[in-house]
Amino acid sequence: MSVTAERKAQIIKEFATVEGDTGSPEVQVAILTERINNLTEHFKDHKKDNHSRRGLLALVSSRRSLLDYLKKKDEARYTKLIGALGIRR
């Protein structure tokens, strides 16, 4: 259900801008996307889980804020990131 430590390390390695980078917007958005995808799969079986759905909306909002920040600061990095993650915008 949640993102395992191994999967998180793999995501960090893939999207990090420098070695040991865990706080860049790219890494944060990638981890949030993984969590959002996991929750989306959860809702296919548990349609009435409104408590978790509220958490999903919070994750989507956080991701949107980070993406808006990245687009404002560096549009090339933003475009590359949404292409790599398959996020439509």
UniProtKB/Swiss-Prot annotation:
InterPro entries in UniProt: Ribosomal_uS15, Ribosomal_uS15_bac-type, uS15_NS1_RNA-bd_sf
One Gene Ontology CC term in the entry: cytosolic small ribosomal subunit
GO BP field: translation
Keywords: Ribonucleoprotein, Ribosomal protein, RNA-binding, rRNA-binding
Function: One of the primary rRNA binding proteins, it binds directly to 16S rRNA where it helps nucleate assembly of the platform of the 30S subunit by binding and bridging several RNA helices of the 16S rRNA. Forms an intersubunit bridge (bridge B4) with the 23S rRNA of the 50S subunit in the ribosome.
Family the entry assigns: Belongs to the universal ribosomal protein uS15 family.
Subunit relationships: Part of the 30S ribosomal subunit. Forms a bridge to the 50S subunit in the 70S ribosome, contacting the 23S rRNA.
Protein name, UniProt field: Small ribosomal subunit protein uS15
Species of provenance: Rhizobium meliloti (strain 1021) (Ensifer meliloti)
